[in-house]
A protein has these predicted regions:
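Short, glycine/proline-biased beta-turn/loop segments that scaffold the active-site neighborhood
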Residues: 458-555, 693, 699-719, 812-830
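A penicillin-recognizing enzyme superfamily signal
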Residues: 379-427, 437-452, 466, 510, ...
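Flexible glycine/proline-enriched surface loops and loop-helix/loop-strand junctions
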Residues: 34-35, 105-108, 199-207, 263-268, ...
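Non-catalytic, structured segments within soluble enzyme domains
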Residues: 1-12, 17-19, 27, 137-141, ...
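Acidic/histidine-enriched alpha-helical segments
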Residues: 141-147, 238-247, 302-304, 315-334, ...
Length: 987
């Protein structure tokens, strides 16, 4: 007794110093566990990398638990951190109104308090595992050590070592078992040292509340019953705790077992059911010793052992003979996982899909791992509004509702087609330092998100990007020339093909008011022909383009008219001017088009090749940086307009060792609609084999920059190379790429090749501009067709561009997750919020204002005029609206030698409207039909415009100025923690 008193006093006194507190900001005074199944599942072992990852993604640690010096020293010695651990935790998510949208608790069935456990369950556990645990006669007892049991186990181990005993008895108490399966590596005891660590850790934990341990010992029993590992079930995963164990392995609910085994509740329940419940509880208590055996192959042995323990318990007077006999008469009936899977159903609503998917991506975890983290998070989504919009989009499949909304008519839908259209909607709100996503939903009920997860040809929405680039160039020219005198301007002589520079200089010469806004307005009033009669040399060949309406073909509209009415040819011609401007901004590039016999060209070309080659090599390096070989090739081929010749040239260059069979399989996969005979395949394989063409010729044939082709090949051979390695290795290739210009006899052939290469380089420049404004892909298709959508886009990325325009040219981070709270009420607690700061100016505010005005005209009298006057505030004040429409009819076409279309296979049809609603809200709405069925549809962007118009009554209450979409500012992602200290968990 004296020893127990001394032990209790000294350990409890020491344990009182092992504290932690929640402090502002980040701290280094914390030690996270490095192993242990419990710590791994809860995410505690991963917290260092998760916190670092989040800080790289614009999160900041606002509060973090800090260890006392004593606790820090204790854990540095390798002992497990003492605190009242959670037996149930999981992912909890709030929406922007602080309303719960997900509350996943694992395990799902457990006891909140010791008093809730039926005495029969406790006595069964203690009889099997730790009979003296709750002995009232020893108030100071250490639950970590059962000395008689420990001595017996030690003798057993000695006997086994001397080979005089076959099996050894275990000496673990429930307290040390909990330490083992929660915190030891792999949940196992690998050595005597590990056993000692478990015992010391359990002892300190037991005495942390004081020298008397009865309540701590009750907590041990409660924790064990709630958390004991019971193998992994098919289709479910890990099973922990008696409650989940009963349901998963036997299909029995914990509440029913409690009723059957509680003498105050079971008087009217059949004895046979009581016996079965007791048998199941006993079986799981026994099975925990070897769960993966007893719960699968060893079920007969488990039945036999359960019978034995039932008899022994009856002999000990713990159960009466009638209950014993009732239990012995039963057999364990395990769940048939094929016929009755133990599936955990998670609400599949779009709010949850979006948020869980975003969280998993943010943390680099699977959804299974994510749900089991000890984590609370908040999203910027408004779940109430999202549900209303989702319901609305689903109802559009009903012909009667679609008719009510006005979706039938020319360039819209017919009643029999309403169910085949998919709709996707995203709504953002402009905050002080972020673009907050309030709604992100569709009517597909699928995790895949059309807004973010797709590359779609969205047609005329690309005109917004082209017009943005154009106005940015005008602003650049204003900055360059706006302060020069008229005389100085008259001395300038830009190239005759650089029409944008020429216009800017002429404008500044003749206009007294040299401020930027009038110049931008004048630039929007420039006229471009809509004629379809011209053939354009672009993308390596001659192309013609058409307008949507034939009556536009004879027009000569201003750019703002062309945007308002979405006329194609003015934007194709504008893109040509932008390409030429880009070419002539580099003096080196311009010189290539000058005198073919200039003797300085060779020396210049060498310098040009080295300098320009490195510029483009770096761009391509960044394009492929961090990608695997397969991802690099996918990215490359996505940007290549596929023909048999181009693909053959690229494949034979990048994979020279490939067999004819591999080569044929590659072409047939990439060109499923093209019939390639064996003879044609052999011809291509031979003609473009290694050494048949130089690197520049290979690039010319494939219509790609030769250095991009070279870099792909180099990275295949040297995947660990740095950019410096690549630059050094490509010295000769950089000279070769540009040197071929002087080896062709005819200047026209030289100029033709030069124009192709310069166009590729110009589109690389343009891509940098687009990327700065949120363009989501690694490349643009180097063709004027990019002006009308051939490079693809994502609706969400276009919406971000609208946000930049609405925000006076300042790009803010797009936010869906704004608060994270890990490990609440534990020593590992950490709260993170979004890093607040200034946005990035990516556009002159004058350019943004000009674009807002242009987009407003699309609604006031253009392709989105259906919306005119439709959105009003609650007091009747009309909202200022603007946007851009676009329709994509995406096909795979086979073209004959004469240019005629031989076959046309529909891939999908899209219609998109990107918009702003008032000063703070913006977004995108897309109608989409995938696959060949899209050939039956003729809807245009009038469809999403009409759908948005029908949504007005739903959106109106959330668009009020200052209402923050009916969201509230959240201080935390979960309830405020209890006072920091030693006991800090829920249950």
């Amino acid at each position: 007794m004296r020893t127990s008193w001394l032990q209790a006093r000294e350990i409890s006194r020491y344990a009182q110093t092992l504290t932690y507190s929640l402090e502002p900001g980040a701290t280094q005074a914390v030690r996270y566990p490095s192993h242990g199944p419990f710590d791994q599942r809860m995410g505690y072992t991963r917290l260092p990398e998760l916190l670092a990852r989040l800080q790289q993604n614009r999160f900041v640690i606002e509060q973090q638990a800090q260890f006392s010096p004593a606790l820090l020293e204790y854990t540095q010695r390798g002992f497990f951190t003492p605190y009242q651990e959670k037996t149930q935790a999981g992912l909890f998510i709030n929406d922007c109104r602080a309303e719960s949208i997900h509350d996943y608790r694992y395990p799902q069935r457990h006891y909140e308090r010791f008093e809730q456990i039926p005495p029969l369950v406790v006595s069964a556990l203690l009889f099997i595992e730790n009979r003296e645990l709750l002995n009232n006669e020893q108030p100071l007892a250490n639950p970590a050590v059962d000395w008689p049991r420990f001595a017996k186990a030690a003798m057993s181990q000695l006997g086994r070592a001397l080979e005089i005993q076959d099996d050894s008895a275990g000496g673990s108490t429930l307290a040390t078992q909990i330490e083992k399966y929660r915190h030891s590596p792999g949940g196992l005891t690998h050595s005597a040292g590990e056993k000692l660590r478990q015992m010391i850790s359990a002892s300190v934990r037991a005495y942390q509340q004081g020298p008397e341990t009865l309540e701590a010992r009750k907590a041990v029993a409660l924790d064990y019953i709630n958390s004991v590992p019971l193998a992994a079930a098919p289709g479910h995963g890990e099973v922990h705790g008696l409650g989940d164990g009963l349901w998963i392995w036997f299909g029995t609910e914990l509440a029913r077992v409690n009723q059957l085994l509680d003498p105050t509740q079971n008087k009217d329940t059949p004895l046979a059911e009581q016996g079965q419940a007791l048998r199941q509880v006993m079986a799981l208590m026994i099975a925990q010793r070897r769960p993966s055996y007893y719960l699968f192959r060893g079920r007969d042995d488990l039945n036999t052992l359960t019978d034995s323990y039932l008899r022994i318990q009856a002999q000990a007077g713990l159960i009466n003979p009638a209950l014993r006999d009732a239990a012995l008469a039963q057999k364990l009936n395990f769940r048939n996982f094929r016929e009755d899977p133990a599936t955990v159903f998670i609400d599949n609503n779009k709010t949850l899909q979006v948020t869980r998917g975003r969280l998993a991506s943010l943390l680099g975890l699977s959804l299974y791992e994510l749900d089991r983290l000890d984590l609370s998070a908040s999203t910027t989504l408004n779940a109430e509004l999202q549900q209303k919009v989702s319901d609305y989009l689903h109802r559009l499949a009903d012909p009667e509702f679609a008719r009510e909304i006005g979706l039938f008519g020319e360039r819209l839908l017919s009643p029999e087609k309403t169910a085949d259209v998919r709709y996707s909607f995203t709504l953002f709100e402009r905050g002080a330092d972020s673009f907050d996503v309030r709604v992100q939903t569709d009517n597909t009920n699928q995790p895949f998100d059309i807004n973010e997860g797709s590359k779609l040809e969205l047609g005329s929405t690309a005109k917004l990007r082209v017009l943005t680039t154009y106005l940015e160039i005008i602003a650049e020219l204003h900055q360059r020339y706006g302060s020069k005198s008229v005389e100085s301007l008259r001395q300038l002589s830009p190239d005759r093909q650089d029409l944008l520079s020429r216009w800017a200089i002429d404008y500044l010469i003749r206009t007294p008011d040299r401020s930027l806004p009038p110049m931008l307005n004048a630039a929007l009033e420039r006229r471009y022909s809509a004629s379809t009669g011209e053939r354009f040399f672009t993308g390596g060949g001659m192309h013609t383009f058409g307008n949507f309406r034939r009556e536009d073909n004879g027009r000569n509209p201003t750019l703002i008219e062309a945007l308002r009415e979405s006329i194609n040819l003015p934007f194709v011609r504008l893109m040509r001017d932008i390409v030429r401007y880009s070419i002539y901004q580099s003096e080196n590039r311009a010189q290539l088009l000058e005198d073919d016999k200039d003797p300085r060209r060779q020396e210049y070309l060498s310098r040009f090749a080295d300098r320009e080659g490195q510029v483009f090599l770096l761009r391509f390096w960044r394009k492929y940086q961090g990608k695997t070989t397969e991802e690099r090739l996918d990215t490359f081929f996505d940007g290549l307009r596929p023909t048999a010749v181009r693909l053959a040239a690229v494949h034979r260059y990048l994979m020279p060792e490939a067999s004819p069979e591999e080569f044929a399989a590659f072409l047939q996969t990439r060109l499923p609609q093209e019939r390639l005979t064996e003879k044609r395949l052999d011809e291509l394989y031979t003609r473009y084999g290694p050494g048949a063409y130089s690197l520049p010729d290979q690039g010319y044939i494939a219509r790609v920059h030769p250095l991009e082709l070279w870099l792909l090949s180099y990275l295949q051979e040297s995947p660990e190379a740095t950019f410096a390695n690549a630059a050094e290795a490509s010295k000769d290739e950089r000279q070769e790429v540009y040197g071929w210009l002087f080896k062709t006899r005819h200047r026209s052939a030289r100029d033709s090749r030069l124009r192709i290469m310069l166009e590729v380089e110009a589109f690389s420049d343009i891509h940098l501009r687009w990327q700065r404004l949120g363009f989501p892909f690694d490349h643009l298709v180097p063709s004027l067709a990019t002006a009308i959508g051939s490079s693809g886009d994502k609706p969400a990325a276009l919406a971000e561009l609208i946000g930049i325009i609405l925000n006076d040219g300042v790009r803010l981070p797009t936010v869906r997750i704004d608060q994270l709270h890990f490990a609440a009420h534990t020593p590992y607690e950490a709260r993170l919020g979004r890093l607040h700061g200034q946005g990035q100016r990516v556009m002159d505010k004058e350019v943004a204002a000009a674009l807002r005005n242009a987009l407003s005209q699309v609604v006031d009298g253009g392709t989105a005029r259906r919306l005119q006057g439709s959105f009003r505030l609650e007091d009747g004040t009309p909202l200022v609206l603007g946007g851009k429409t676009g329709t994509g009819d995406n096909r795979i076409e086979t073209v004959g030698r004469g240019g005629q279309v031989l076959s046309s296979l529909a891939r999908n049809r899209t219609a998109t409207f990107v918009f702003f609603l008032g000063d703070n809200h913006f977004g995108t709405l897309t109608a989409y039909v995938p696959g060949r069925e899209s050939d039956k549809f003729r809807f245009t962007s009038a469809l999403p415009v009409q759908v948005l118009k029908g949504m007005e009554p739903i959106l109106r209450p959330y668009l009020q100025p200052g209402a923050r979409s009916q969201c509230q500012q959240q201080l935390a992602a979960s309830p405020e923690p209890k006072e920091a200290g030693m006991i800090k968990s829920e249950g």
